[in-house]
Amino acid sequence: MNHSSKKNKNRILRNKARIYCDVNLHKPKEYWNYEALNVKWETQDDYEIIRKIGRGKYSEVFEGANIKNNEKCVIKVLKPVKKKKIKREIKILQNLCGGPNIITLYDVVRDPQSKTPSLIFEYINNTDFKHLSPTLTDFDVRYYIRELLHALDFCHSNGIMHRDVKPSNVMIDHQKRKLYLIDWGLAEFYHPNQDYNVRVASRPYKGPELLVDMEDYDYSLDMWSLGCMFAGMLFQKDPFFHGHDNIDQLVKIVKILGTEEFYAYLDKYGIVVDHTILSIIGKHPKKPWSRFITKENQHLAVPEAIDFLEKLLRYDPAERLTTREAMEHPYFKPLSH
């Protein structure tokens, strides 16, 4: 893959966000310069671990409690990673604190001996998405997707890309009809002329730009991931694009969206993809979305849902709906504002 990266340095056209492009230009440097963050570590003695509730590549997650007031919390114990990455996550959580549907960071603590850092978050009475999704009504899907858009619009408007949107990073308290976007460990500040690491997001939710080494991606990466998640909900098939490796992931996408628009996207930006990969991809017509509609999902896969999906799952990042445009889509009309 590196071979194509070098070639892609001299591309004919660079990509730029269509919305919120210069947000960080108008913010003070300390807003986005997370490496300069001086973390004020608190003592972890105020918190106790109750039970393990999850684990990721970079952390282990526990249900915990604040001993002082007996309030439940979530304790995210970070595995050894670069200091820079921890600072980035903390800075982003601080910047977004209080935003709509954004998980609240209560505290940052570390073990005085081992120096292992932990992040303390509000507790959410979460229903596992895999179990919840099949039970959701048409109205529920519209409602929760719009709630997720509120969180994404807030983070994008604050100059931040999440870069790991997927069902397991969306917590839903269905009783309270509250949604939270969690796990900001891969989130990053958007600067229009910066190149970014393409090794982000989980494979089924990776945008085509990541799979072809397009390093000048932007917020619209999150809109692709949202589209994948939405497709999974609509057609009750999650993950919707299920590749076994990154090349196979691209093949899965191309077999549905077709090769014609894929090559048009590569040509527009002058993206070079390895010949061996192109030969694996081959040539495929675009599949109509109606192919995926069944008796079981037709109550969800209504025409305006398909129209909305189609406007998210575009190869070209510049063609995808922005968060603002997405919220204006007729699909959300039935929700009272």
Curated annotation (Swiss-Prot):
GO BP field: asexual reproduction; DNA damage response; DNA repair; regulation of cell cycle
Entry GO MF terms: ATP binding; identical protein binding; protein kinase activity; protein serine kinase activity; protein serine/threonine kinase activity
Keywords associated with the record: ATP-binding, Kinase, Nucleotide-binding, Serine/threonine-protein kinase, Transferase
InterPro entries membership: CK2_alpha, Kinase-like_dom_sf, Prot_kinase_dom, Protein_kinase_ATP_BS, Ser/Thr_kinase_AS
SUPFAM superfamilies tied to this protein: Protein kinase-like (PK-like)
Enzyme Commission number(s) of this protein: 2.7.11.1
Entry's family note: Belongs to the protein kinase superfamily. CMGC Ser/Thr protein kinase family. CK2 subfamily.
Presence of the UniProt keyword Kinase in the record: yes
Reaction catalysed by this enzyme: L-seryl-[protein] + ATP = O-phospho-L-seryl-[protein] + ADP + H(+); L-threonyl-[protein] + ATP = O-phospho-L-threonyl-[protein] + ADP + H(+)
Protein name as catalogued: Casein kinase II subunit alpha
Subunit and interaction comment: Tetramer of two alpha and two beta chains.
Domain Protein kinase: 47-332
Binding of ATP, residues: I53, G54, R55, G56, K57, Y58, S59, E60, V61, K76
Active site per database record: D164
Pfam families: Pkinase (PF00069)
Function: Casein kinases are operationally defined by their preferential utilization of acidic proteins such as caseins as substrates. The alpha chain contains the catalytic site.
Segments traversing the membrane: none
One GO term describing the cellular component: cytosol
Enzyme class at the top of the EC tree: transferase
